[in-house]
UniProtKB/Swiss-Prot annotation:
It is a multi-pass membrane protein. Disulfide bonds: none annotated. Its main location: membrane. HAMAP family: MscL. This is Large-conductance mechanosensitive channel. The gene is mscL. It is found in: Cell inner membrane. Channel that opens in response to stretch forces in the membrane lipid bilayer. May participate in the regulation of osmotic pressure changes within the cell.
Length: 134
């Protein structure tokens, strides 16, 4: 089997295509959640707690200075506000996935299982049993 044909069979499997679609949809969903958190939820929470912009929250470890040559040495800062926004995004995405999985499980569990058809062996044994009863 040629390398190209093997690759084509690999790519055309249902699982690979499903995974590719899921990755694309997941990336788009991530952008939506990022916009939701950055532009709507974080500002609302900031207003509720006194006008704080979470993305700007930081801890300055060392202030900016000017060295002997007159060049500015930037401050050493831990920007934990963006980290808080990322945690909030994660929680929202995890909750959305939880809801989706819960709905899928509900649909799967609601579908009645098709009646199991007995195998030929079982049918033959039943026929023998019924004929012996007579």
């Amino acid at each position: 089997m040629s390398f190209i044909r093997e690759f084509k069979e690999f790519v055309m499997r249902g699982n690979v295509i499903d995974l590719a679609v899921a990755v694309v949809i997941g990336a788009a969903f991530g952008k939506i959640v990022t916009a939701l958190v950055d532009k709507i939820i974080s500002p609302l929470i900031g207003v509720m707690v006194g006008g704080i912009d979470f993305s700007k929250l930081s801890l300055t470890l060392k202030a900016a200075t000017v060295d002997a040559a007159g060049k500015e040495v930037p401050a050493v800062v831990i920007g934990y506000g963006d980290f808080l926004n990322t945690i909030l995004q994660f929680i929202i995405i995890a909750f959305a996935i939880f809801i989706i999985v819960k709905m899928i499980n509900k649909v799967i569990n609601k579908q009645p299982l098709p009646p199991e058809t007995p195998s030929e062996d079982v049918l033959l044994l039943r026929e023998i049993r019924d004929s012996l009863k007579k």
